[in-house]
A protein has these predicted regions:
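Structured, active/binding-site neighborhoods that engage oxygen-rich ligands
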Residues: 1-247
């Protein structure tokens, strides 16, 4: 069966969610890349449900985003949603609750492969976040992840992605996963986990390696981009010129 390449970042995000699911709880986190990729405890979580909700919204732009999220979220309400999000799902008139948790960044993979420009990425990511995560850090995290995926999907080399994210989102990406393993405490905020997830992606050699690095660093999720394997990276010295056509 041929898979539409637009869906590959979504598949990668779901894969990362399933693999990382058994390491989310305190006491289950590890500091090594040597672990079984799947076992009997591996499962999809709320992040998969919301990733699919955003993808559905992008495919059906005439439908209301909140209605789509409520429909899928209520159908799968017991797959790991946090307390505040469950309250949002159960409310007859759901309102954003000023969250800066990384849930806003976990659900945006489809935006990165659907948008045509960085401006569109920023707009769609904000729109997807503010239904719940209307704190500036919650919006920023969603936009940063969606932008990183967009740039990767459009064949930008990692050095350009790192440069763009640092300059436009003020994230410190000048660390290694080894540093993070030694010093990082689990943090579910956007500002405390999105940079670490992007670092795992930047250090990785492929999708599996990215997931293993993210898990070993105890980052709450793995930023996965999964695009056609025959990607042709641009020369390293044309980052700024290349961005101009993508704005």
């Amino acid at each position: 069966m041929k898979i539409n390449e637009h869906s590959l970042p979504v598949i990668g995000a779901i894969l990362g969610d399933i693999v990382g699911s058994r390491f989310e709880l305190k006491g289950t986190r590890i500091k090594t890349v040597e672990f079984d990729f799947f076992n009997i405890d591996s499962h999809y979580t709320d992040d998969t449900v919301l990733t699919l909700a955003i993808a559905k919204w992008l495919l059906e732009p005439n439908n209301n985003l909140i209605d789509i999220v409520l429909s899928l979220g209520r159908q799968y309400i017991d797959v790991g949603f946090g307390h505040s999000f469950k309250n949002w799902l159960r409310s007859p008139t759901p309102q954003p609750y000023n969250s800066y948790g990384n849930g806003s960044a976990m659900r945006v993979s489809a935006i990165g492969s659907t948008a045509s420009t960085i401006s569109e990425v920023m707009s769609l990511a904000k729109e997807s976040a503010i239904i719940t995560h209307n704190h500036e850090e919650g919006i920023k995290g969603a936009q940063a992840v969606a932008t990183a995926i967009f740039l990767a999907y459009n064949s930008f080399p990692k050095v350009c992605i790192k440069e763009y994210i640092e300059e436009n989102f003020d994230y410190n990406l000048n660390r290694s996963i080894s540093d993070i393993r030694n010093n990082y405490n689990f943090d579910s905020s956007c500002q405390g986990s999105v940079p670490e997830a992007i670092i795992a992606f930047l250090e990785s050699t492929d999708v599996e390696d990215s997931i293993r690095l993210a898990v070993s660093g105890s980052t709450p999720f793995s930023l996965i981009y999964s695009v056609k394997s025959s990607i042709k990276y641009r020369e390293l010295n044309v980052c700024n010129t290349s961005y101009e056509g993508m704005m």
